[in-house]
Amino acid sequence: GYVNFSSSAEARSEMDWLLGIELTRYASIKAHQFIRIGRCVCPIVAHIVEREKAIKDFVPKPYSAVSSKEETNGETIELTSKRTFEEGHEAEAQALADAFNKAGATVTSVKTERKTVNPGKLFSMSDLQSFACKADKTLSPADVLAATQTLYEGGYVTYPRTNSSYLATNEVVKVDAAIKGLAQNGITGLINKPKSKSIYDDSKIEAHSAITPTGKWPGTLSDAQKTVYECILNRFCAVFCEEDCTVDRTTIVIHCYDEDFTLKGDVQVTPGWRKFEKPSSGDKMLPKLNKGDAININFQLVGKMTTPPKRYTVESLNNWMVAPMRGAEKEDAEYSDEEWKEILSDATICTEATRADTVDRCVKSQYISLKKGVYYGEPAGFQLVEIMDKLGIVLDVPVTVNLSKQL
């Protein structure tokens, strides 16, 4: 076993020397300027530059939507048809709006179910970086890693460089101690859940378990450390909250002409873990409606423009690096590292320990920039991609993922 680890480390070192140092020298000589080439740097920069090109080349096109926004029983109900109309088809859009208004709208179904809402999983480093950078857009992934490392060295949180969202079954005692330590500092309402497979699962841990507070209460912290610690603490409290979070989940179906419109909303019954960590989006309030109720409508044409692709955020770039082969349409999906790992095993850009530092190198090399949590392609990044293309250097996602799997 140890021989294989040693051989893997040696191969990785030699591969990084070949791709990093030798190709950097080669590209720099050919380009007559310093060009940083890296096994993971290049696909990251290329990915962001490709998105930047798509945004710059995007030509917005006008189209029409058909929407109604009227008040019923004291609440505004907004209905928008699934159908849209390209420029020049306004007459068809108006005909649909007229048909909707003539037909009237009626509630055909109201279903309410009491649901238990589960909190998010404990944090891996990538999940923590995504969450913390969304909470404080001045932070970069490297800032989050550095803050977590300092908290770890101070004994306030567990080891940071982990790709797991689970705890080992032999860590039950450690969690008991953390809960006890937090209770001494006024945080109550927590209970250990040793039989929960969504928390304790040895099969989900490769080397290190999820990041958790130790129970040791920190003193003076920097702003970054405070933000990161609160993220870790609140998620831990949410996961081990004794009270369930329950909601009445209502689904209302409204029929108008030839289309069904579905409204969904939650009404909180017991806050549970939401006392510690607010949900990512606010509850949508729905009016009190019964089957057969008439809905006030006034469908009209709404002129809109198609929008360009979104730039990568810290979260969406992290999601992409964890599973870069899964397809762009899934980049914003809220899956944990563990869930992506099951979908596409080992197909990653960088490791959990190196991901933040690699992106930080891209920023310091001025290939990309990070502004308020959003990544931008910079002129040097465009130049890097162009030079690699001219020199026939192929370090795209499939090549990089294949190298990572072999190493």
List the predicted regions and their residue ranges.
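Toprim catalytic domain recognition across nucleic-acid enzymes
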Residues: G1-E339, I343-Y367, K372-Y375, P379-E386
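Short, exposed interaction patches on small structured surface elements
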Residues: D389-K390
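Non-catalytic DNA-recognition/assembly elements of restriction-modification systems
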Residues: D396-L407
